[in-house]
């Protein structure tokens, strides 16, 4: 009611003001400019009498809401899911009501907002499944370290800003830290160099280092089995430490180093002006001495540098000499079709990489591969075999992965092919339990190769995998080919010799097939 009264007062003031200005000799255009309204509004006030203004204000027309009949549905949905957005509600309305009228998003937003205010339904955060935590015992001295990469924009000496990239590693027992900065994104060679600088700084190396599944270190995945880059694999063998990779997109399983990355961003790099990278790394070493490793740790209540004096005696010796890698990365323009032109060929990038004509990526050629890194995050976004021909488009199907049938349908097709064999069903159940993320990919490999073999061959191959604890579609494929060749050879042998074939060669062949596959 107060709003209506105020509205009437405003209109009365405008009505009197328009007439006052007209009496002073101003025309409609001049009055409009003075009051900040349109000329037609001035004309409307001049044509309206004072009594008519009161009459219009007191008469209220009731308009039927265009979405009024959906009020109960929207109200019930909001009461059950108060965190739902107007955009999602719009989609649900179209899904539940095929005859839902064509209205703009703003109309639905206003309607949902009106119902929230009418029934007092506030927008709450979505209830998430609570994750259980427990305090783990401290790891032994010298056993574990955790490593990760970070980046941040910082101001530069001559004005503007630039992004710096850094490698962080922390010894999990003493919380003793090391960081190394770079102007370019980390690739495998630069990451190895940072590792060696850390080992030199520590005066030794731990037995195991925990990482994210970062493509700087991982070349590809073989249906759940991680294949490391050649240079990083050689570095591991040379330094004799064991890499441990966390589950993808699960930073809470590697919390210590995640906190170090955050600590560097929110403490050391805050308001720090970049002079040059060597200077920044020198400043970082001094910061580690006085703050990062020199102050009492918030969790352990111990000073990392003092604890490190104990842990240092448990580290494995490091005898190497860090050698900085040569600068190899160059900037390349991203085309509208999400490709990069390099040496007369086109290499694909994930859909959506291109955003404008200024989009750039870092490109590096290494070990017969073309690696493309995001200039924004420094992360590797694509890796292709180097093509020696010209005019070719090298495309990664993951960059435009089509929708396909579900994993359950694939499993049903395989079971139909093997007439419901129990061992095949058990193998697929175990595969799903052990590699749920890659379950469908493994089934697709089996499904695609099935038409080339009899069901008895497939059953025997799966039986061998089940017996040896191997859950990998490529292993099944290799074994099917091996069993097929063996049966053909046995058939030919039976024609010429009644002696059974030797089994030692068969076992040796199986071992060769399984070599390189992780049993888990």
Curated annotation (Swiss-Prot):
HTH IS21-type domain: residues covered: 13-78
Top-level lineage group: Bacteria
Any GO BP annotation: transposition
GO molecular function: DNA binding
Sequence ranges assigned to domain Integrase catalytic in this UniProt record: 136-312
Keyword vocabulary terms for this entry: DNA recombination, DNA-binding, Transposable element, Transposition
UniProt keyword annotation of DNA-binding present: yes
Biological role: Involved in the transposition of the insertion sequence.
Family of the protein in this entry: Belongs to the transposase IS21/IS408/IS1162 family.
Name of this chain's protein: Transposase for insertion sequence element IS21-like
Organism from which the protein derives: Bacteroides fragilis
């Amino acid at each position: 009611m107060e709003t209506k009264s105020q509205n009437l007062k405003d209109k009365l003031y405008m009505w009197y003001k328009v007439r006052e200005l007209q009496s002073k000799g101003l025309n409609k255009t001049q009055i409009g400019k003075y009051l900040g309204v349109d000329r037609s509004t001035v004309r409307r006030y001049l044509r309206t009498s004072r009594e008519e203004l009161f009459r219009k204000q007191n008469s209220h027309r009731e308009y039927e809401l265009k979405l009024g009949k959906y009020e109960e549905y929207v109200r019930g949905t909001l009461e059950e899911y108060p965190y739902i957005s107007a955009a999602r509600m719009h989609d649900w309305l179209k899904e539940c009501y095929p005859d839902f009228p064509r209205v703009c998003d703003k109309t639905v937003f206003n309607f949902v907002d009106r119902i929230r205010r009418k029934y007092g339904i506030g927008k709450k955060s979505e209830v998430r499944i609570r994750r259980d935590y427990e305090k783990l015992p401290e790891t032994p001295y010298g056993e574990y370290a955790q490593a990760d990469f970070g980046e941040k924009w910082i101001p530069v000496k001559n004005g503007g800003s630039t992004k710096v990239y850094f490698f962080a590693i922390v010894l999990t027992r003493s919380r003793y830290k090391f960081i190394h900065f770079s102007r370019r994104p980390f690739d495998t060679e630069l990451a190895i160099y940072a590792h060696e600088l850390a080992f030199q700084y520590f005066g030794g190396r731990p037995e195991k280092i925990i990482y994210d599944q970062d493509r700087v270190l991982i070349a590809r995945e073989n249906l759940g089995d991680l294949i490391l880059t050649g240079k990083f694999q050689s570095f591991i063998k040379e330094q004799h430490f064991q890499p441990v990779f966390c589950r993808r997109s699960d930073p809470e399983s590697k919390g210590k180093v995640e906190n170090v990355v955050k600590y560097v961003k929110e403490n050391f790099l805050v308001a720090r002006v970049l002079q040059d990278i060597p200077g920044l790394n020198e400043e970082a070493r001094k910061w580690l001495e006085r703050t990062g490793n020199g102050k009492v740790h918030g969790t352990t209540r111990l000073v990392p540098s003092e604890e490190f004096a104990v842990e240092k005696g448990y580290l494995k010796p490091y005898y190497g000499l860090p050698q900085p890698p040569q600068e190899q990365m160059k900037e390349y323009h991203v085309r509208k079709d999400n490709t990069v032109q390099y040496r007369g060929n086109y290499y694909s990038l994930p859909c959506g990489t291109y955003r404008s004509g200024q989009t750039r990526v870092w490109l590096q050629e290494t070990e017969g591969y073309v690696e493309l890194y995001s200039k924004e995050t420094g992360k590797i976004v694509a890796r292709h075999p180097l093509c020696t021909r010209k005019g070719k488009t090298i495309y990664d199907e993951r960059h435009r992965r089509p929708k396909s049938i579900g994993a359950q349908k694939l499993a049903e097709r395989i079971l139909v092919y093997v007439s419901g064999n129990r061992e095949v069903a058990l193998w697929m159940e175990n595969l799903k339990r052990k590699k749920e993320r890659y379950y469908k990919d493994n089934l697709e490999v089996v499904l695609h190769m099935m038409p080339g073999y009899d069901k008895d061959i497939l059953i025997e191959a799966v039986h061998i995998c089940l017996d040896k604890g191997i859950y990998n579609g490529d292993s099944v494929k290799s074994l099917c080919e091996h069993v097929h060749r063996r049966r053909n050879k046995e058939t030919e042998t039976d024609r010429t010799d009644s002696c059974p074939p030797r089994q030692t060669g068969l076992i040796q062949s199986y071992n060769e097939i399984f070599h390189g596959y992780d049993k888990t």
